[in-house]
Design a protein with these regions (language model features):
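Basic, alpha-helical nucleic-acid-binding regions used in initiation and control of genome expression
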Residues: 110
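Non-ligating segments of multi-cofactor redox enzymes
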Residues: 1-106, 115, 120, 124-182
Length: 182
């Protein structure tokens, strides 16, 4: 019989259509933007810069080593290192990025920049609502827009953020013990 497969498929569709009216768990759509689907822990969109203090410029973890810029496959990261040094979030004088831009129109969200960063300064964001009023405003994201607090990072990736903070605290304790021993 030629139409048996079509009838079986239509039966499955009708069963799911009718069943979704009686069982709320079977609904797959949500009323966006009032309701939002939960994003998984490992969801990633575009890179952000993490800072640890109240001031995004003073607490930025990035020391402008340019490893992420060199390793980026589409070469969408643009960094200019500062001429002077400022104390970082741990009080150690470090260089900082005078300019840190990411061309979002070129970025392919591969997360290589996150993997190669030795300072845990660049992470992937979960924000996917990137619309702007002007056509070209969303293409190039500057340091001010990329900078997000460590608290924000804890909200979007709680497990990974706790691991990173524990590793950074351990490194700070080891550095303090080494300084005390010397």
């Amino acid at each position: 019989m030629i139409g048996v497969g079509i009838l079986k498929g239509m039966g499955v569709t009708a069963r799911n259509f009718v069943g979704s009216y009686f069982e709320k768990d079977r609904l797959t759509t949500v009323q966006y933007p009032e309701e939002r689907s939960p994003l998984p822990e490992n969801y990633r969109n575009f890179p952000i810069l993490i800072y640890d203090t109240d001031d995004p410029n003073a607490g930025l973890r990035c020391v402008a080593c340019k490893i992420c810029e060199k390793e980026c496959p589409p070469q969408c990261i643009y960094i200019i290192k500062s001429e002077d040094k400022k104390p970082d979030y741990m009080g150690k004088p470090q260089f900082y990025p005078a300019v840190f831009d990411i061309d979002i129109s070129v970025c392919m969200s591969c997360q290589i920049c996150v993997e190669v960063c030795p300072f845990e300064a660049i992470k992937m964001d979960k924000d996917f609502e990137l619309s702007k009023r002007e056509r070209f405003d969303a293409l190039l994201t500057r340091k001010g827009e990329l900078s997000k607090s460590n608290e924000y990072y804890h909200r979007i990736h709680p497990i990974e953020a706790a691991e990173v903070d524990a590793k950074l605290a351990e490194a700070a304790a080891a550095a303090a013990a080494k300084k005390k021993a010397a």
